[in-house]
């Protein structure tokens, strides 16, 4: 005897009486007379109809119901079939309503009493009223994604833990990298009704603007916000004002403390990442440096001494930590290691590897013996790097616009569960191919939704 797979994935014994009961209810809804033998015959025809769809002794409840509709229609009971379809849709609406219904009391209590594992899911979210607000809105938004946006197969795969759709609590994209050069040239502004700043003329102003920019953009994205060539673009400001090392360090210190201040939803600090070149990249070396939105009479390549000052100041601040000696969580630095990297016993090298050994803070991009250059890659966050050479092959698109690049979302496939459920290696890869298609479809859907919301003005900055 075969079995039936329910909508929640559970397996139950097949019971033909349930088919007979459903058909009887469809007749009763129309107040249509029938003989019990007619119902039994129709139920038997249903089993014969769905028999070719049985796989490994299992038939899905959806296939059974599809067969009921077709058998009723072909047997001359089109009106009963229509009644059955309406009944089926009504039951589906009830199931969806129950699935999306949120108990406001449980929602608040689970956070306040720390009864829900999600309260401590993100180590950057402090237990606070801001975290409570984020938890409440996140639960609503997650249900909106699963019930109103994603198709049933995607939502079911997430709910059954076949895949995990990250950041369902946010109606936004995942992470983004921004052009620090564009910020230096244009500064903050361009949003109707909001304050617009002039391009920074001094390092202290630029550091404050970067803090504000990262805080603002973090509220429009779920994940990390990144700047590339941090030291290269800051160095001309040191040179233009002939700043001392102490003055430079004070400015960089204000930036580090600023990005570690809770300014994003959920009482969190902006998740920020910066890439430091260490050595001026070839694509910027001969370009005129920009300060105050204007080109200077020297190039970025002329600012090697100032780059070293910026790097030294940043590393020393990260090593020293805050007033209690606690290491800074942000920004997460990524250093480019190229053939030009100076491996000698310089002070900056010593400090760099001291910071690495003390906190394990920085990431290193190894370009030695690589066909890529630092300008080809943008580090978005701790787990994502984008190859700009691939993006350049794309024609337009919101996420393929030069240095301002990003990621639409993240989906994790539950590989251990997949392996456990697979009968053999071939079955494993068959299941994996299917889940990869489901995951890709979810990301495509999310991209369409976020792009539409962007065009509608939901992300003003």
Regions found by a protein language model. Name each.
Residues 1-107:
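Charged, amphipathic alpha-helical regulatory modules used
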Residues 90-94, 100-461:
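Conserved catalytic cores of very large enzyme subunits
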